[in-house]
From Swiss-Prot:
Keywords: Amidation, Disulfide bond, Ion channel impairing toxin, Knottin, Neurotoxin, Potassium channel impairing toxin, Secreted, Toxin, Voltage-gated potassium channel impairing toxin
Protein name (database record): Tau-theraphotoxin-Pc1b
Naturally occurring in which organism (per UniProt): Psalmopoeus cambridgei
Family statement: Belongs to the neurotoxin 10 (Hwtx-1) family. 62 (Vatx) subfamily.
GO molecular function, one term: toxin activity
Length: 35
């Protein structure tokens, strides 16, 4: 399936697009600090 963009809902980092990570407990994708 499609990856989740910034502030998209997620269950794990693998749900998120490149350079995003799933914020545990908040359940959304946010920048992981990489370029």
């Amino acid at each position: 399936g499609a990856c989740r963009w910034f502030l998209g809902g997620c269950k794990s980092t693998s749900d998120c697009c490149e350079h995003l990570s799933c914020k545990m407990g908040l359940d959304y994708c946010a920048w992981d600090g990489t370029f």
